[in-house]
């Protein structure tokens, strides 16, 4: 992709409004250092020096979309608690529309606490309640979806198996979005495989793709287009989900784009250094759907999302990528 084409696509990012539907959560990082072992048990003592919070899950997809320049609305469920207030405030500070964040007093806001010491993540604590939505909350979610749908150019479904998306609710939302001819994308969860149908794009990672295809995981080979098991998985998911585009992310091997009736297309990674892969999948789907909504063809959109992923894995924590960083990444890799 030449520089002019990239700039044309990026210039259209700010004209898009994207609706993100899924499980929102708050990421908490406790940063510190280890200087001794506890006398109570053979474990390190971490002296906490600072604390930071970031939107996580579907909220991180919204954060990524805002960093790329688009308008964003997020539809999700919070608890009536401090983490929920913190998450809402963080999103509002970043310009994300939070009118679709529905409070359910019978569940806590999902909170993931990571302890990072001496530059290494040591442990993660999850505080959450993974149950289906009560009927009245599900009705509110669908009402908001129908209200917002007419104003957006694309819809992203983000399932983290926390309970927002039931198969019934997803089916209704998919049908409405497809009828309205919106760009649609989904990031599946291997612990609770929902049935997607006819979306513009689906973006599993390698292990998620194998799980969805019902095949035992097989370690990758270096030549992606000679990875017969991966190619079989891709074709299986094209038949199962019937997406127009299936983008399987492959970590250090990049990505592989599958489309009905076309040969698989491998996109090598452009990451220079990898410090933290948390949230990279959120960046991929955010960039992919935004590029497609902005008029990029599937290969162009996949290449742009590959560069965005290369940027964020070089940062610590759930990070984002800006249009300027995308331009710089493409420039580096043209040399």
How would you name each of these model-derived features?
Residues 2-7, 39, 43-111, 329:
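Substrate-binding N-lobe of the ribokinase-like
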Residues 163-264:
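Conserved phosphate/ATP/ADP-binding segment of small-molecule kinases
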Residues 236, 240, 244-245, 270-333:
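Conserved post-catalytic alpha-helical subdomain immediately downstream of the catalytic base
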Residues 101-107, 114-149:
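Conserved phosphate-binding/catalytic loop of the ribokinase/pfkB sugar-kinase fold
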Residues 13, 149-150, 193-197:
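A short, aliphatic-rich alpha-helical micro-motif
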Residues 1-35, 330:
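Positively charged, low-complexity intrinsically disordered leader regions
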Residues 148-164:
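Short acidic, glycine-rich surface-loop motifs adjacent to enzyme active sites
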Residues 19-21, 124, 153-156, 185, ...:
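Structural motif
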